[in-house]
Protein backbone atom coordinates (compact mmCIF):
# COMPACT_ATOMS: atom_id res chain seq x y z
CA UNK A 1 0.00 0.00 0.00
CA UNK A 2 2.91 2.35 0.70
CA UNK A 3 3.98 2.07 -2.94
CA UNK A 4 0.52 3.14 -4.11
CA UNK A 5 0.54 6.15 -1.77
CA UNK A 6 3.95 7.20 -3.04
CA UNK A 7 2.88 6.80 -6.66
CA UNK A 8 -0.30 8.79 -6.12
CA UNK A 9 1.40 11.74 -4.50
CA UNK A 10 4.30 11.74 -6.99
CA UNK A 11 1.75 12.07 -9.76
CA UNK A 12 -0.11 14.83 -7.91
CA UNK A 13 3.06 16.77 -7.18
CA UNK A 14 4.74 16.52 -10.52
CA UNK A 15 1.91 16.62 -13.03
CA UNK A 16 2.55 19.88 -14.84
CA UNK A 17 0.47 22.93 -13.95
CA UNK A 18 0.28 23.71 -17.65
CA UNK A 19 -0.53 20.20 -18.83
CA UNK A 20 -2.72 18.88 -16.04
CA UNK A 21 -5.81 20.17 -14.35
CA UNK A 22 -4.89 18.99 -10.86
CA UNK A 23 -3.01 21.47 -8.70
CA UNK A 24 -0.41 20.81 -6.08
CA UNK A 25 -2.87 21.36 -3.30
CA UNK A 26 -4.18 19.92 -0.08
CA UNK A 27 -2.55 18.15 2.81
CA UNK A 28 -0.20 15.26 2.19
CA UNK A 29 0.10 12.82 5.07
CA UNK A 30 3.36 11.10 5.87
CA UNK A 31 3.56 7.63 4.35
CA UNK A 32 5.88 4.61 4.76
CA UNK A 33 9.11 5.35 2.96
CA UNK A 34 10.44 3.87 -0.29
CA UNK A 35 13.97 2.76 0.60
CA UNK A 36 15.10 2.41 -3.02
CA UNK A 37 14.06 6.00 -3.68
CA UNK A 38 15.85 7.25 -0.57
CA UNK A 39 19.11 5.46 -1.42
CA UNK A 40 19.12 6.79 -4.98
CA UNK A 41 18.18 10.26 -3.80
CA UNK A 42 21.06 10.30 -1.28
CA UNK A 43 23.48 9.10 -3.97
CA UNK A 44 22.35 11.96 -6.21
CA UNK A 45 22.71 14.56 -3.43
CA UNK A 46 26.18 13.26 -2.49
CA UNK A 47 27.27 13.36 -6.13
CA UNK A 48 25.99 16.89 -6.71
CA UNK A 49 27.51 18.21 -3.48
CA UNK A 50 30.83 16.74 -4.61
CA UNK A 51 30.45 18.57 -7.92
CA UNK A 52 29.64 21.77 -6.01
CA UNK A 53 32.86 21.44 -4.01
CA UNK A 54 34.82 20.85 -7.23
CA UNK A 55 33.14 23.84 -8.89
CA UNK A 56 33.76 26.11 -5.91
CA UNK A 57 37.53 25.62 -6.30
CA UNK A 58 37.25 26.81 -9.91
CA UNK A 59 34.88 29.72 -9.31
CA UNK A 60 36.88 32.84 -8.53
CA UNK A 61 35.74 35.73 -10.72
CA UNK A 62 32.40 37.30 -11.59
CA UNK A 63 32.58 35.63 -15.00
CA UNK A 64 33.17 32.23 -13.38
CA UNK A 65 30.19 32.72 -11.09
CA UNK A 66 27.65 33.98 -13.65
CA UNK A 67 28.73 32.09 -16.78
CA UNK A 68 31.28 29.41 -15.77
CA UNK A 69 33.91 31.57 -17.48
CA UNK A 70 32.28 31.06 -20.88
CA UNK A 71 34.03 27.70 -21.10
CA UNK A 72 31.04 25.35 -21.37
CA UNK A 73 30.95 23.58 -24.75
CA UNK A 74 27.95 23.68 -27.05
CA UNK A 75 27.08 20.03 -26.36
CA UNK A 76 27.42 20.43 -22.59
CA UNK A 77 25.31 23.58 -22.68
CA UNK A 78 22.70 21.85 -24.84
CA UNK A 79 22.44 19.05 -22.28
CA UNK A 80 22.19 21.59 -19.45
CA UNK A 81 19.50 23.56 -21.31
CA UNK A 82 17.55 20.36 -21.82
CA UNK A 83 18.01 19.56 -18.13
CA UNK A 84 16.82 23.03 -17.20
CA UNK A 85 13.71 22.76 -19.36
CA UNK A 86 12.63 19.09 -19.43
CA UNK A 87 10.61 18.52 -16.31
CA UNK A 88 9.03 15.71 -14.39
CA UNK A 89 5.88 17.74 -14.99
CA UNK A 90 6.02 17.26 -18.74
CA UNK A 91 7.18 13.66 -18.29
CA UNK A 92 4.14 12.73 -16.18
CA UNK A 93 1.62 15.25 -17.52
CA UNK A 94 2.09 14.64 -21.25
CA UNK A 95 2.27 10.88 -20.76
CA UNK A 96 -1.03 11.11 -18.86
CA UNK A 97 -2.62 13.11 -21.66
CA UNK A 98 -1.52 10.51 -24.22
CA UNK A 99 -2.87 7.80 -21.91
CA UNK A 100 -6.29 9.47 -21.70
CA UNK A 101 -6.58 11.23 -25.08
CA UNK A 102 -4.11 9.51 -27.39
CA UNK A 103 -2.82 11.59 -30.28
CA UNK A 104 -3.99 14.87 -28.71
CA UNK A 105 -1.30 14.55 -26.05
CA UNK A 106 1.19 15.63 -28.70
CA UNK A 107 -0.36 19.12 -28.73
CA UNK A 108 1.28 20.01 -25.44
CA UNK A 109 4.66 18.47 -26.19
CA UNK A 110 4.74 20.46 -29.44
CA UNK A 111 3.86 23.60 -27.49
CA UNK A 112 6.86 23.13 -25.22
CA UNK A 113 9.19 22.21 -28.08
CA UNK A 114 8.23 24.68 -30.81
CA UNK A 115 9.62 27.66 -28.89
CA UNK A 116 13.17 26.37 -29.32
CA UNK A 117 13.49 26.92 -33.09
CA UNK A 118 12.42 30.51 -32.38
CA UNK A 119 15.32 30.80 -29.95
CA UNK A 120 17.68 29.17 -32.47
CA UNK A 121 16.82 31.33 -35.48
CA UNK A 122 15.89 34.65 -33.86
CA UNK A 123 17.74 34.96 -30.58
CA UNK A 124 20.73 32.67 -29.92
CA UNK A 125 23.40 34.28 -32.10
CA UNK A 126 22.53 37.92 -31.48
CA UNK A 127 21.98 37.36 -27.76
CA UNK A 128 25.46 35.85 -27.33
CA UNK A 129 27.14 38.52 -29.46
CA UNK A 130 25.49 41.43 -27.63
CA UNK A 131 25.23 40.19 -24.04
CA UNK A 132 27.60 39.28 -21.26
CA UNK A 133 25.79 37.98 -18.17
CA UNK A 134 22.02 38.65 -18.44
CA UNK A 135 19.51 39.39 -21.22
CA UNK A 136 19.24 42.94 -19.84
CA UNK A 137 22.74 43.51 -21.27
CA UNK A 138 21.18 43.01 -24.71
CA UNK A 139 17.97 44.96 -24.10
CA UNK A 140 19.89 47.97 -22.78
CA UNK A 141 22.72 47.85 -25.36
CA UNK A 142 21.61 51.03 -27.16
CA UNK A 143 18.78 52.11 -24.85
CA UNK A 144 18.90 53.92 -21.51
CA UNK A 145 20.53 51.60 -18.99
CA UNK A 146 18.75 52.34 -15.72
CA UNK A 147 15.06 52.08 -16.72
CA UNK A 148 15.56 49.14 -19.10
CA UNK A 149 17.62 47.14 -16.62
CA UNK A 150 15.07 47.88 -13.89
CA UNK A 151 12.23 46.60 -16.07
CA UNK A 152 14.20 43.53 -17.20
CA UNK A 153 15.19 42.70 -13.63
CA UNK A 154 11.59 43.07 -12.41
CA UNK A 155 10.33 40.81 -15.22
CA UNK A 156 13.02 38.25 -14.37
CA UNK A 157 12.32 38.32 -10.64
CA UNK A 158 8.56 37.89 -11.09
CA UNK A 159 9.11 34.85 -13.34
CA UNK A 160 11.71 33.43 -10.93
CA UNK A 161 9.42 33.93 -7.91
CA UNK A 162 6.44 32.22 -9.56
CA UNK A 163 8.56 29.26 -10.65
CA UNK A 164 10.27 28.95 -7.28
CA UNK A 165 6.99 28.76 -5.37
CA UNK A 166 5.71 25.92 -7.55
CA UNK A 167 9.01 24.03 -7.36
CA UNK A 168 9.43 24.47 -3.60
CA UNK A 169 5.95 23.19 -2.80
CA UNK A 170 6.41 20.20 -5.09
CA UNK A 171 9.87 19.36 -3.80
CA UNK A 172 8.86 19.82 -0.17
CA UNK A 173 5.97 17.40 -0.46
CA UNK A 174 8.08 14.88 -2.36
CA UNK A 175 10.78 14.83 0.33
CA UNK A 176 8.07 14.72 3.00
CA UNK A 177 6.85 11.49 1.45
CA UNK A 178 10.20 9.87 0.76
CA UNK A 179 11.62 10.57 4.22
CA UNK A 180 8.45 10.87 6.31
CA UNK A 181 9.65 14.36 7.25
CA UNK A 182 7.43 17.23 8.30
CA UNK A 183 6.57 19.40 5.27
CA UNK A 184 8.26 22.48 6.77
CA UNK A 185 11.48 20.58 7.43
CA UNK A 186 11.35 19.21 3.89
CA UNK A 187 11.02 22.70 2.36
CA UNK A 188 13.93 23.97 4.48
CA UNK A 189 16.06 21.01 3.32
CA UNK A 190 15.33 21.77 -0.34
CA UNK A 191 16.09 25.47 0.21
CA UNK A 192 19.43 24.67 1.86
CA UNK A 193 20.52 22.34 -0.96
CA UNK A 194 19.48 24.91 -3.55
CA UNK A 195 21.47 27.67 -1.84
CA UNK A 196 24.55 25.46 -1.42
CA UNK A 197 24.70 24.59 -5.13
CA UNK A 198 24.47 28.20 -6.27
CA UNK A 199 26.28 29.98 -3.43
CA UNK A 200 29.45 27.89 -3.61
CA UNK A 201 29.43 26.44 -7.12
CA UNK A 202 27.82 29.21 -9.18
CA UNK A 203 27.05 28.50 -12.82
CA UNK A 204 29.57 25.66 -13.08
CA UNK A 205 27.88 23.59 -10.37
CA UNK A 206 24.42 24.51 -11.66
CA UNK A 207 25.38 23.40 -15.17
CA UNK A 208 26.61 19.99 -14.07
CA UNK A 209 23.60 19.39 -11.82
CA UNK A 210 21.42 20.09 -14.86
CA UNK A 211 23.52 17.83 -17.11
CA UNK A 212 23.32 14.91 -14.66
CA UNK A 213 19.57 15.39 -14.28
CA UNK A 214 19.09 15.44 -18.08
CA UNK A 215 21.07 12.22 -18.51
CA UNK A 216 19.12 10.47 -15.73
CA UNK A 217 15.74 11.58 -17.08
CA UNK A 218 16.61 10.60 -20.65
CA UNK A 219 17.90 7.23 -19.46
CA UNK A 220 14.77 6.56 -17.41
CA UNK A 221 12.40 7.55 -20.21
CA UNK A 222 14.44 5.58 -22.79
CA UNK A 223 14.37 2.45 -20.64
CA UNK A 224 10.59 2.70 -20.25
CA UNK A 225 10.07 3.24 -23.99
CA UNK A 226 12.35 0.30 -24.91
CA UNK A 227 10.52 -2.01 -22.51
CA UNK A 228 7.18 -0.91 -23.97
CA UNK A 229 8.37 -1.56 -27.53
CA UNK A 230 9.83 -4.92 -26.48
CA UNK A 231 6.35 -5.94 -25.33
CA UNK A 232 4.93 -5.27 -28.81
CA UNK A 233 7.82 -6.77 -30.79
CA UNK A 234 9.20 -3.29 -31.58
CA UNK A 235 6.24 -2.68 -33.90
CA UNK A 236 4.47 0.69 -33.80
CA UNK A 237 1.60 -0.83 -35.76
CA UNK A 238 1.06 -3.38 -32.99
CA UNK A 239 1.43 -0.70 -30.30
CA UNK A 240 -1.25 1.54 -31.79
CA UNK A 241 -3.65 -1.21 -32.87
CA UNK A 242 -3.53 -2.93 -29.46
CA UNK A 243 -3.99 0.43 -27.72
CA UNK A 244 -7.10 1.13 -29.81
CA UNK A 245 -8.53 -2.26 -28.80
CA UNK A 246 -7.96 -1.65 -25.08
CA UNK A 247 -8.76 2.08 -24.75
CA UNK A 248 -12.41 3.00 -24.01
CA UNK A 249 -12.34 5.59 -26.82
CA UNK A 250 -11.18 3.04 -29.37
CA UNK A 251 -10.16 4.46 -32.75
CA UNK A 252 -10.88 8.00 -31.48
CA UNK A 253 -7.53 8.09 -29.63
CA UNK A 254 -5.79 8.36 -33.01
CA UNK A 255 -7.84 11.39 -34.08
CA UNK A 256 -6.73 14.95 -33.23
CA UNK A 257 -8.90 17.76 -31.88
CA UNK A 258 -10.67 16.24 -28.89
CA UNK A 259 -8.87 18.32 -26.26
CA UNK A 260 -9.22 21.72 -27.92
CA UNK A 261 -12.70 22.84 -26.93
CA UNK A 262 -11.87 26.55 -26.74
CA UNK A 263 -9.62 27.66 -29.62
CA UNK A 264 -8.88 31.06 -28.03
CA UNK A 265 -7.53 29.49 -24.83
CA UNK A 266 -5.60 26.93 -26.88
CA UNK A 267 -4.04 29.66 -29.02
CA UNK A 268 -3.21 31.75 -25.96
CA UNK A 269 -1.60 28.79 -24.20
CA UNK A 270 0.35 27.91 -27.34
CA UNK A 271 1.65 31.46 -27.75
CA UNK A 272 2.63 31.59 -24.08
CA UNK A 273 4.58 28.34 -24.34
CA UNK A 274 6.23 29.26 -27.65
CA UNK A 275 7.33 32.80 -26.91
CA UNK A 276 7.54 32.48 -23.13
CA UNK A 277 10.38 30.00 -23.56
CA UNK A 278 12.33 32.70 -25.40
CA UNK A 279 11.83 35.04 -22.43
CA UNK A 280 12.71 32.78 -19.50
CA UNK A 281 15.70 34.36 -17.69
CA UNK A 282 17.24 31.08 -16.53
CA UNK A 283 17.19 29.74 -20.11
CA UNK A 284 18.54 32.96 -21.69
CA UNK A 285 21.35 33.13 -19.13
CA UNK A 286 22.71 29.84 -20.41
CA UNK A 287 23.73 31.43 -23.73
CA UNK A 288 26.48 33.38 -21.99
CA UNK A 289 28.16 30.21 -20.68
CA UNK A 290 29.60 29.39 -24.13
CA UNK A 291 32.50 31.10 -25.87
CA UNK A 292 30.83 32.47 -29.01
CA UNK A 293 27.72 32.60 -31.20
CA UNK A 294 28.63 29.35 -32.98
CA UNK A 295 28.60 27.44 -29.70
CA UNK A 296 25.36 29.20 -28.73
CA UNK A 297 23.68 27.93 -31.90
CA UNK A 298 25.06 24.44 -31.26
CA UNK A 299 23.63 24.61 -27.73
CA UNK A 300 20.10 25.17 -29.02
CA UNK A 301 20.56 22.55 -31.73
CA UNK A 302 21.54 19.87 -29.20
CA UNK A 303 18.93 20.98 -26.66
CA UNK A 304 16.14 20.89 -29.26
CA UNK A 305 17.22 17.44 -30.47
CA UNK A 306 17.37 16.03 -26.94
CA UNK A 307 14.00 17.52 -26.00
CA UNK A 308 12.41 16.34 -29.24
CA UNK A 309 13.66 12.84 -28.46
CA UNK A 310 12.32 13.14 -24.90
CA UNK A 311 8.84 14.22 -25.98
CA UNK A 312 8.81 11.43 -28.57
CA UNK A 313 9.51 9.01 -25.72
CA UNK A 314 6.59 10.40 -23.69
CA UNK A 315 4.32 9.54 -26.63
CA UNK A 316 5.50 5.90 -26.57
CA UNK A 317 5.24 5.85 -22.78
CA UNK A 318 1.65 7.13 -22.92
CA UNK A 319 0.56 4.44 -25.39
CA UNK A 320 2.57 1.87 -23.44
CA UNK A 321 0.64 2.82 -20.33
CA UNK A 322 -2.62 2.09 -22.19
CA UNK A 323 -1.33 -1.43 -22.89
CA UNK A 324 0.54 -2.35 -19.71
CA UNK A 325 -1.26 -0.23 -17.11
CA UNK A 326 -4.75 0.30 -18.51
CA UNK A 327 -5.23 -3.43 -19.07
CA UNK A 328 -3.80 -4.45 -15.67
CA UNK A 329 -6.37 -4.60 -12.83
CA UNK A 330 -3.55 -4.31 -10.26
CA UNK A 331 -3.29 -0.61 -11.11
CA UNK A 332 -7.06 0.03 -10.89
CA UNK A 333 -9.32 0.75 -7.92
CA UNK A 334 -12.68 -0.89 -7.23
CA UNK A 335 -14.44 1.42 -9.70
CA UNK A 336 -11.99 0.62 -12.49
CA UNK A 337 -10.27 4.02 -12.35
CA UNK A 338 -6.49 4.31 -12.34
CA UNK A 339 -5.06 4.37 -8.80
CA UNK A 340 -4.17 7.95 -7.93
CA UNK A 341 -5.73 9.39 -11.08
CA UNK A 342 -4.70 9.49 -14.72
CA UNK A 343 -1.53 11.47 -13.98
CA UNK A 344 -0.29 8.21 -12.45
CA UNK A 345 0.05 6.52 -15.85
CA UNK A 346 3.81 6.96 -16.44
CA UNK A 347 4.77 6.17 -12.85
CA UNK A 348 2.60 3.04 -12.80
CA UNK A 349 4.32 2.08 -16.05
CA UNK A 350 7.73 2.50 -14.36
CA UNK A 351 6.55 0.02 -11.73
CA UNK A 352 5.17 -2.33 -14.40
CA UNK A 353 8.36 -2.49 -16.49
CA UNK A 354 11.02 -2.18 -13.77
CA UNK A 355 9.52 -3.03 -10.39
CA UNK A 356 10.09 -1.16 -7.13
CA UNK A 357 13.79 -0.56 -7.87
CA UNK A 358 13.02 1.33 -11.07
CA UNK A 359 10.17 3.12 -9.31
CA UNK A 360 12.72 4.31 -6.76
CA UNK A 361 14.98 5.49 -9.58
CA UNK A 362 12.14 7.49 -11.18
CA UNK A 363 11.35 9.03 -7.77
CA UNK A 364 14.97 10.15 -7.37
CA UNK A 365 14.99 11.53 -10.93
CA UNK A 366 11.84 13.50 -10.14
CA UNK A 367 13.58 15.20 -7.23
CA UNK A 368 16.76 15.73 -9.26
CA UNK A 369 14.62 17.53 -11.82
CA UNK A 370 13.30 19.96 -9.23
CA UNK A 371 16.76 20.69 -7.79
CA UNK A 372 18.18 21.35 -11.26
CA UNK A 373 15.42 23.84 -12.03
CA UNK A 374 15.53 25.73 -8.72
CA UNK A 375 19.32 26.08 -8.94
CA UNK A 376 19.03 27.70 -12.38
CA UNK A 377 16.20 29.94 -11.22
CA UNK A 378 18.10 31.08 -8.13
CA UNK A 379 21.19 32.01 -10.14
CA UNK A 380 19.08 33.92 -12.68
CA UNK A 381 17.33 35.83 -9.89
CA UNK A 382 20.61 36.61 -8.12
CA UNK A 383 22.23 37.92 -11.31
CA UNK A 384 19.20 40.14 -12.01
CA UNK A 385 19.60 41.75 -8.59
CA UNK A 386 23.40 42.00 -8.42
CA UNK A 387 24.30 42.72 -12.06
CA UNK A 388 21.24 44.57 -13.36
CA UNK A 389 19.88 46.36 -10.29
CA UNK A 390 22.85 46.82 -7.96
CA UNK A 391 25.87 47.19 -10.25
CA UNK A 392 24.14 48.98 -13.14
CA UNK A 393 21.29 50.94 -11.52
CA UNK A 394 22.24 51.58 -7.88
CA UNK A 395 26.01 51.92 -8.39
CA UNK A 396 25.69 53.17 -12.00
CA UNK A 397 28.41 50.82 -13.27
CA UNK A 398 30.94 51.81 -10.59
CA UNK A 399 30.72 48.63 -8.48
CA UNK A 400 33.85 46.50 -8.27
CA UNK A 401 33.75 42.86 -9.32
CA UNK A 402 34.21 41.72 -5.72
CA UNK A 403 31.42 44.00 -4.54
CA UNK A 404 29.01 42.69 -7.19
CA UNK A 405 29.85 39.07 -6.36
CA UNK A 406 29.20 39.74 -2.67
CA UNK A 407 25.76 41.20 -3.46
CA UNK A 408 25.00 38.23 -5.71
CA UNK A 409 25.81 35.72 -2.98
CA UNK A 410 23.80 37.68 -0.41
CA UNK A 411 20.91 37.62 -2.89
CA UNK A 412 21.23 33.84 -3.28
CA UNK A 413 20.83 33.41 0.48
CA UNK A 414 17.94 35.91 0.53
CA UNK A 415 16.21 34.10 -2.35
CA UNK A 416 16.66 30.83 -0.50
CA UNK A 417 15.00 32.26 2.62
CA UNK A 418 12.18 33.80 0.57
CA UNK A 419 11.66 30.54 -1.35
CA UNK A 420 11.43 28.60 1.93
CA UNK A 421 8.94 31.09 3.42
CA UNK A 422 6.80 31.14 0.27
CA UNK A 423 6.94 27.36 0.03
CA UNK A 424 5.57 27.12 3.58
CA UNK A 425 3.02 29.89 2.97
CA UNK A 426 1.64 28.27 -0.20
CA UNK A 427 1.59 24.71 1.19
CA UNK A 428 -2.20 24.36 0.94
CA UNK A 429 -2.86 26.83 -1.87
CA UNK A 430 -3.76 26.17 -5.49
CA UNK A 431 -0.54 27.08 -7.27
CA UNK A 432 -1.30 25.44 -10.61
CA UNK A 433 -1.69 28.81 -12.34
CA UNK A 434 1.80 30.03 -11.43
CA UNK A 435 3.78 28.32 -14.18
CA UNK A 436 1.22 29.43 -16.77
CA UNK A 437 1.50 32.98 -15.46
CA UNK A 438 5.31 32.79 -15.51
CA UNK A 439 5.28 31.82 -19.19
CA UNK A 440 2.73 34.55 -19.95
CA UNK A 441 4.86 37.23 -18.26
CA UNK A 442 8.01 35.99 -19.99
CA UNK A 443 6.16 36.13 -23.34
CA UNK A 444 4.56 39.53 -22.64
CA UNK A 445 7.39 41.44 -20.95
CA UNK A 446 10.79 39.86 -21.57
CA UNK A 447 10.34 38.47 -25.10
CA UNK A 448 9.03 41.66 -26.80
CA UNK A 449 11.86 43.75 -25.33
CA UNK A 450 14.56 41.25 -26.36
CA UNK A 451 13.18 40.73 -29.86
CA UNK A 452 12.51 44.38 -30.71
CA UNK A 453 15.76 45.65 -29.19
CA UNK A 454 17.69 43.32 -31.52
CA UNK A 455 15.62 43.65 -34.70
CA UNK A 456 13.69 46.95 -34.77
CA UNK A 457 15.77 50.05 -35.40
CA UNK A 458 13.01 52.48 -34.33
CA UNK A 459 12.67 51.12 -30.80
CA UNK A 460 13.26 53.71 -28.08
CA UNK A 461 13.53 53.55 -24.31
CA UNK A 462 10.10 55.17 -23.94
CA UNK A 463 8.48 52.52 -26.14
CA UNK A 464 10.28 49.59 -24.51
CA UNK A 465 9.42 50.79 -21.00
CA UNK A 466 5.76 51.43 -21.75
CA UNK A 467 5.23 48.21 -23.71
CA UNK A 468 7.15 46.06 -21.23
CA UNK A 469 5.31 47.31 -18.16
CA UNK A 470 1.95 47.13 -19.97
CA UNK A 471 2.64 43.51 -20.98
CA UNK A 472 3.67 42.51 -17.47
CA UNK A 473 0.71 44.19 -15.75
CA UNK A 474 -1.81 42.97 -18.35
CA UNK A 475 -0.66 39.36 -17.94
CA UNK A 476 -0.96 39.55 -14.14
CA UNK A 477 -4.32 41.37 -14.11
CA UNK A 478 -5.95 39.10 -16.71
CA UNK A 479 -4.70 36.00 -14.88
CA UNK A 480 -6.24 37.30 -11.64
CA UNK A 481 -9.55 38.06 -13.39
CA UNK A 482 -9.56 34.70 -15.21
CA UNK A 483 -11.23 31.42 -14.19
CA UNK A 484 -8.24 29.94 -12.35
CA UNK A 485 -7.84 32.67 -9.71
CA UNK A 486 -11.14 34.60 -9.81
CA UNK A 487 -13.31 31.47 -9.61
CA UNK A 488 -11.20 28.59 -8.24
CA UNK A 489 -9.06 30.54 -5.74
CA UNK A 490 -11.22 33.55 -4.82
CA UNK A 491 -14.53 31.69 -5.06
CA UNK A 492 -16.50 34.00 -7.38
CA UNK A 493 -19.27 32.50 -9.52
CA UNK A 494 -17.96 33.66 -12.91
CA UNK A 495 -14.64 35.01 -14.18
CA UNK A 496 -14.42 38.58 -15.46
CA UNK A 497 -11.86 37.47 -18.08
CA UNK A 498 -13.17 34.24 -19.66
CA UNK A 499 -9.89 32.64 -20.80
CA UNK A 500 -7.47 30.67 -18.67
CA UNK A 501 -4.23 31.96 -20.21
CA UNK A 502 -3.68 35.66 -21.03
CA UNK A 503 -0.64 35.51 -23.35
CA UNK A 504 -2.55 36.18 -26.58
CA UNK A 505 -3.94 39.44 -25.22
CA UNK A 506 -1.03 40.58 -23.04
CA UNK A 507 1.47 40.02 -25.88
CA UNK A 508 -0.68 42.13 -28.22
CA UNK A 509 -0.83 44.90 -25.62
CA UNK A 510 2.96 44.73 -25.14
CA UNK A 511 3.85 44.86 -28.84
CA UNK A 512 1.28 47.55 -29.71
CA UNK A 513 2.30 49.66 -26.71
CA UNK A 514 5.98 49.34 -27.59
CA UNK A 515 5.34 50.25 -31.25
CA UNK A 516 3.03 53.18 -30.50
CA UNK A 517 5.19 54.86 -27.86
CA UNK A 518 8.35 54.34 -29.95
CA UNK A 519 7.06 55.79 -33.24
CA UNK A 520 5.58 58.78 -31.40
CA UNK A 521 8.84 59.43 -29.52
CA UNK A 522 10.29 62.56 -31.11
CA UNK A 523 12.78 63.29 -28.34
CA UNK A 524 16.50 63.86 -28.90
CA UNK A 525 17.25 60.76 -26.83
CA UNK A 526 14.96 58.67 -29.04
CA UNK A 527 16.72 59.91 -32.19
CA UNK A 528 20.13 59.04 -30.71
CA UNK A 529 18.95 55.55 -29.77
CA UNK A 530 17.76 54.92 -33.32
CA UNK A 531 21.13 56.03 -34.70
CA UNK A 532 22.94 53.56 -32.43
CA UNK A 533 21.11 50.61 -34.00
CA UNK A 534 23.58 50.29 -36.91
CA UNK A 535 26.56 49.76 -34.60
CA UNK A 536 24.51 47.28 -32.57
CA UNK A 537 23.53 45.43 -35.74
CA UNK A 538 27.17 45.04 -36.81
CA UNK A 539 28.12 43.72 -33.37
CA UNK A 540 25.15 41.33 -33.29
CA UNK A 541 26.09 39.85 -36.68
CA UNK A 542 29.85 39.68 -36.36
CA UNK A 543 30.50 39.37 -32.64
CA UNK A 544 33.32 41.90 -32.97
CA UNK A 545 34.29 43.00 -29.48
CA UNK A 546 32.79 40.11 -27.51
CA UNK A 547 34.77 38.36 -24.83
CA UNK A 548 35.02 34.59 -25.14
CA UNK A 549 36.38 31.76 -23.05
CA UNK A 550 38.05 32.58 -19.77
CA UNK A 551 38.15 36.27 -20.53
CA UNK A 552 34.42 36.43 -20.91
Swiss-Prot record:
It comes from Erwinia tasmaniensis (strain DSM 17950 / CFBP 7177 / CIP 109463 / NCPPB 4357 / Et1/99). The keyword Membrane applies. It is found in: Cell inner membrane. Keywords: Cell inner membrane, Cell membrane, Ion transport, Membrane, Sodium, Sodium transport, Symport, Transmembrane, Transmembrane helix, Transport. GO terms for biological process: plasma membrane acetate transport; sodium ion transport. The chain crosses the membrane at residues 6-26, 35-55, 78-98, 103-123, 151-171, 185-205, 208-228, 264-284, 305-325, 357-377, 407-427, 431-451, 467-487, 496-516. Transports acetate. The gene is actP. This is Cation/acetate symporter ActP. It comes from the Bacteria. One of its GO terms (molecular function) is acetate transmembrane transporter activity. The keyword Cell inner membrane applies. GO terms for cellular component: plasma membrane.
Amino acid sequence: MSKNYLLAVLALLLSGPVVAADAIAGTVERQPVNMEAIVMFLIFVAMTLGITYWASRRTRSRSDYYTAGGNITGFQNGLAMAGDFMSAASFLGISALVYTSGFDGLIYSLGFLVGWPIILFLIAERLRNLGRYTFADVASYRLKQMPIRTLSACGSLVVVALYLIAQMVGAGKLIQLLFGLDYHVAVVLVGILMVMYVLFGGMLATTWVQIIKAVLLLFGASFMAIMVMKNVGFSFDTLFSEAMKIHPKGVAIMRPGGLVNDPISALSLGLGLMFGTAGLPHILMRFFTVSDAREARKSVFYATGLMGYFYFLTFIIGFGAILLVGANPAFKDATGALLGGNNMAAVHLADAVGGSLFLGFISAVAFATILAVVAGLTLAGASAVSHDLYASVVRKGQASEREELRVSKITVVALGVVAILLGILFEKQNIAFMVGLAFSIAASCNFPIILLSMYWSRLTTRGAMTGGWLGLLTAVILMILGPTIWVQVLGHARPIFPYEYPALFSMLVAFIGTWLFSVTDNSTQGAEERLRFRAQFVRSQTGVGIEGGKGH
